[in-house]
UniProtKB/Swiss-Prot annotation:
Cytoplasmic topology ranges: 1-499, 546-659, 707-1771
Compositional bias ranges of the Basic and acidic residues kind: 1431-1457, 1537-1561
Gene label: KIDINS220
Record lineage: Eukaryota, Metazoa, Chordata, Craniata, Vertebrata
Protein name: Kinase D-interacting substrate of 220 kDa
Subcellular location field: Membrane; Late endosome
Amino acid sequence: MSVLISQSVINYVEEENIPALKALLEKCKDVDERNECGQTPLMIAAEQGNLEIVKELIKNGANCNLEDLDNWTALISASKEGHVHIVEELLKCGVNLEHRDMGGWTALMWACYKGRTDVVELLLSHGANPSVTGLYSVYPIIWAAGRGHADIVHLLLQNGAKVNCSDKYGTTPLVWAARKGHLECVKHLLAMGADVDQEGANSMTALIVAVKGGYTQSVKEILKRNPNVNLTDKDGNTALMIASKEGHTEIVQDLLDAGTYVNIPDRSGDTVLIGAVRGGHVEIVRALLQKYADIDIRGQDNKTALYWAVEKGNATMVRDILQCNPDTEICTKDGETPLIKATKMRNIEVVELLLDKGAKVSAVDKKGDTPLHIAIRGRSRKLAELLLRNPKDGRLLYRPNKAGETPYNIDCSHQKSILTQIFGARHLSPTETDGDMLGYDLYSSALADILSEPTMQPPICVGLYAQWGSGKSFLLKKLEDEMKTFAGQQIEPLFQFSWLIVFLTLLLCGGLGLLFAFTVHPNLGIAVSLSFLALLYIFFIVIYFGGRREGESWNWAWVLSTRLARHIGYLELLLKLMFVNPPELPEQTTKALPVRFLFTDYNRLSSVGGETSLAEMIATLSDACEREFGFLATRLFRVFKTEDTQGKKKWKKTCCLPSFVIFLFIIGCIISGITLLAIFRVDPKHLTVNAVLISIASVVGLAFVLNCRTWWQVLDSLLNSQRKRLHNAASKLHKLKSEGFMKVLKCEVELMARMAKTIDSFTQNQTRLVVIIDGLDACEQDKVLQMLDTVRVLFSKGPFIAIFASDPHIIIKAINQNLNSVLRDSNINGHDYMRNIVHLPVFLNSRGLSNARKFLVTSATNGDVPCSDTTGIQEDADRRVSQNSLGEMTKLGSKTALNRRDTYRRRQMQRTITRQMSFDLTKLLVTEDWFSDISPQTMRRLLNIVSVTGRLLRANQISFNWDRLASWINLTEQWPYRTSWLILYLEETEGIPDQMTLKTIYERISKNIPTTKDVEPLLEIDGDIRNFEVFLSSRTPVLVARDVKVFLPCTVNLDPKLREIIADVRAAREQISIGGLAYPPLPLHEGPPRAPSGYSQPPSVCSSTSFNGPFAGGVVSPQPHSSYYSGMTGPQHPFYNRPFFAPYLYTPRYYPGGSQHLISRPSVKTSLPRDQNNGLEVIKEDAAEGLSSPTDSSRGSGPAPGPVVLLNSLNVDAVCEKLKQIEGLDQSMLPQYCTTIKKANINGRVLAQCNIDELKKEMNMNFGDWHLFRSTVLEMRNAESHVVPEDPRFLSESSSGPAPHGEPARRASHNELPHTELSSQTPYTLNFSFEELNTLGLDEGAPRHSNLSWQSQTRRTPSLSSLNSQDSSIEISKLTDKVQAEYRDAYREYIAQMSQLEGGPGSTTISGRSSPHSTYYMGQSSSGGSIHSNLEQEKGKDSEPKPDDGRKSFLMKRGDVIDYSSSGVSTNDASPLDPITEEDEKSDQSGSKLLPGKKSSERSSLFQTDLKLKGSGLRYQKLPSDEDESGTEESDNTPLLKDDKDRKAEGKVERVPKSPEHSAEPIRTFIKAKEYLSDALLDKKDSSDSGVRSSESSPNHSLHNEVADDSQLEKANLIELEDDSHSGKRGIPHSLSGLQDPIIARMSICSEDKKSPSECSLIASSPEENWPACQKAYNLNRTPSTVTLNNNSAPANRANQNFDEMEGIRETSQVILRPSSSPNPTTIQNENLKSMTHKRSQRSSYTRLSKDPPELHAAASSESTGFGEERESIL
């Protein structure tokens, strides 16, 4: 019952059900009942904080001091929970204040712990003890302080609590308060006098724990009490150390201000500074450094603060520390200095800081490594550069570390050198250039692969062909290294057990035992020999197994194993040489033996004493044999060589017994004798023994006596080496004579070959003796043939590989000169001779090879006709062959390059393919019709070439078909000349389909190819032409254009110079044809006029080979003799002594026409077949080229069109209207185009000045519309640039000025020829302007060849530098004065012969005079348009020619007037080119009057100035090219005007008044000009041909040069060829009036004594040494030099003519050509350089025609001003 009642009371208390509790308490008086935890209802109510229930229970007599099971009372429960009123009630009841619970805690303790401030205050007021302690002796104040109850701390302190009381560990309330940063508690405690230095747990003081927690304010409070700031914790850390490590900057500063010691180390030895550095706290480090912290104290592992800063990579900290001058050389325990550590971390900034502070680069770590070792091993160029910036430290490159490595060697062991990047190339050697510099990597790899092919049967002769001075010798060493690598000579043999080992060990041990037995005792001898035998075999076993184990610990065993094997193998070889006949080597097809090479070191055949140098070469080869085979083997072979009579038995025999049996018998006798002597001694008693000894001695003695001769031979052979014998023979050359000496050489060479073969058969190797012959092209030419014969005789048998490195042209020339008459009469020439000697020709064409990767071909058919079925096993095998480049294999480093397994597998695959290829090729070649003239030697040569070419193609990852490659190689090998024609055509002609067969191409160009050797001596190097045609027609495989693309870059047997020669001769032929001379033209072919193609290649402007008009196309006229082209007489082809023509002669040109013309022009990308002129035809322009609408009358006479609408005057609507008028535009797109124009506000001014490319992007037209629109814009720009309407004189004489560009109708209206004749002619134009040149390279990027990207060589270099780049100056420096003199003489002869041929019976000299400049200057200048077209082609984008892209109008100020005197020389007679005489030349001095305001020094710089005034584009950088060499070379067809009135004044220069102070200066200047040009005329070709760069195109211009250039440009007047109607307007010039023979007049160009006036128009075309300081390195994006390179000047006095006559001359300028094959004259309208002349005319103004000096001054000034403004507006 009571339990129920009590439960009810407790329940009611817990439920706080007061009414029920009251009711229950009234019934039941027991209020102190407990629950299961021993709690009474009062405890529960006190804990719950229910005051009313507590009061009720107390009123009913509840006991306040009862305890529960944990000794808790109601007071403790109420205090813990903070119920103040209940505590107060309980206190009133007299509760026990000091009662402790189970943990010894009183109510006060709990209240302090829980932070019950009111309860604490109440308990203290009732007398509670504040110093009571609980568990671990913790006081209430400690709990309050540690838990941050500041008010309680204050109350306790006021009530007498101990301020410095401590717990069990000595930790005071202050430490506890500071540990958590309870600032108020700290303040109360400090105020009551708490001890700040008392240490608590872990020796921590209040300051330390406050610092560790980072409580700045607490630290500040504690520091106010002046604590001991240097106290440390148990780890030795002071407060400052802790603050520094933790990064509390403010605390550190406070501590430092309080006077803390900064250098106290902790237990590990680290100082405060090191701690701060390790923590990366920059500000703290600075603060410590300001307090003079010791920076050199070594901490843990001997690391200083500086080292730690470096290790942390903190450059700021390093900089701060370095400012305090630390010791930078203090090492850590690993020996590392800060610099070494920084280098290891690759921290460039820190390294630089340390070096600036003087850290030593020579410091070493424990491995002996310097920072340089580390930097170079880490491949850090910048670090190495920093470390080596002091030149004195360069010596450290050669300081080895403990492993013996030097930085230099470490660098050398890597493929890409760092030191070379720092210092530049250390030395120019094949290994250093790595082949890439010269592009020879693939050549050397492919050749090495061929020559190391085990199945390749020597002897073979390889020809490395390149021009003299091209650096081909660099390839030789690289080839040697590659061959050694391919041959795998670095593999070392390991020790093996063999019977020879057993025999030798038994012999050695037996001999040793005999020795001891003989000297000491027989038993000792036996014991020693057996013991030694056992030791030897134990040693052999260890070596055998140890040498095959991996790991550095067994490296010594490997070394011993290889050395032992080498020596035993050598001993075995010696024994085999003496006793064994060499076995036959197995067939290489069944077992491929490893190959090894021996090289000659002395490979230079000197011109003096060729025999001696050959002897030296063979001697070096014998030395190489001795090094490879050993000293004894090579010398003993001379004695023990196998005679052919020995037969094929295994053993050598003596007296029918194998020699080794006799040898063993003798050895046995000797051993037996010694044994008997050892046992029995010499004792007369032993008669039997003595008899045996005597017989043994007899046998041995007899053997020695019989072999005396052999012993003598052995002795002689050992003492006299092969080198010594050769030198002895050479010293007796005067006695032996040449034949005897050759016999000695031949014997020695044969002995060497036999020795190599014998040793190979024993060692199962293939030895190939490589004879490298360099320098033949430097020999005296009369000795070359002798040297070749000698080499062929000596090395034509045996394992020899002869490598010729020479210039084939020099060699062939020398051979031709020295061949005997029998060979020459039998049609054998130098080419045949060299072809017979050389089995594998390799023409080094590095530029073509370097571009080969552009032509990667992925198609499997490789250009086959789609229907042809050429797939099969071979092609599958082709695809399976690894595509690894040979060059890349060697670049991967030594490990990869020497990985024999990979190399072997790769090469075995290639050899399988090669064998299959050879088999298939042989079958292919035999079945073809053209096989009839292929000899076995030719077959071998073809297979060699195919093999090399195939490797190069594979190396460049070009997929190909072997059959096609073989056909191509046969084509290039048998008919190189005709193949070069095909290639030249493909290079110069774009748009040729890939599938077009070479047969088709050949049919197009065949009639342009000379047919007789008299015309072209190079025909002699070709085979039968009938076989050539049969070959091209052969059914399988049919070669197509694509095959040429694929194979040409890697073709090594075709001389690239052939194409240069063909182009040179062709250019000369065409230029002669242009002059209208009596040169019989090449055959022509009838055909419809071709539309001009942007990629076609007419090499001349008006070639006689290209007139489709009235020529009888089918007539084949005779071709001139070859001397017509060359400077040589006789059949010898002049490889060098031929004219040089600028490279841009050979590239396509494009002729912009009017917009209407473009309507009828087919697409530029058309692939119509070209007619059969090989691209020599001139592009025919429609007559409707003007800006007006085309009419039929445009070809005949008709009214001149109205005034041209200026582009600048058009507004936006007018531009839209103009757009709609363009015929051919897509009408559906016109609204969109007009919208774009209006949106972008494109008016006339915008069109006149904008960049064409930007306009294209903005207009966003389709291709055809854009082409038409662009052409219209460019034509309008061009037309506007020709009109200066504000000049009244221009307006008044507009009808007599030259017709603007593209207006044939206007010209035709004044034509004096009959209309019928004119209309039948085809007007030809060469539209070429300087602004077209000037803007080249400005708006476009790199030249694009969008269609035929494989034509890497469309621009050929000069004759002398076909191997290297055009800028190669190395070769030029090698040209001696003698060579240049030979060039000069050759060109004189060449020009003379050309002139004589021109003056032949068929020449057309209508007025009885011919032109002296026609031969040479036409040769130089007819290519004027070629410059434009060539550069224009480079600008081609998306296969579209852009004639005037981005071109700006070059109009001068409108105040300028046109000077017709500068536009040319009037040719009034019927002669195509008038001779310009001395008088004409004098009149050129009027050009000097253009400089009246200049200083005399500036005027005299006539030849030093560069062409600046051609347009602003000239200021841009230009591409370096030999195109500069020929100057601007404008064509000769710009109209030149002349007046009858001025004819009286011809030659009278001084008639035009000028300022007195300048009266004589221009004359002196021009006389000086003549002197300069006298040599320039003949030296021009020389410098060009030898690669000397023209220096007229300097980018370094000055403004004062521009005006001087104007003077040149005024004299630079161009020639217009006139028709018969003007023949009577000009008389014979005075200076030539006495010369009746036109040849004499023509020859004046070649005379050095009499300077032709045409020479003086060659303004600065080719500088020589005697020119004024103008020798600069130049570059080409501008036109070179002056306008006139070849257009002989029109004198100013001649230009003073009445304009009535000028009108007649201006009407139509025509050339009449009368070739022998043409029944009708051809009139050619040539508008070349119209735009240029008009621009120049605007600059030169009418005032120059006046005789008033002020006007002259005005002309010059207005010109200068105009140019300056123009430049500003454009730039």
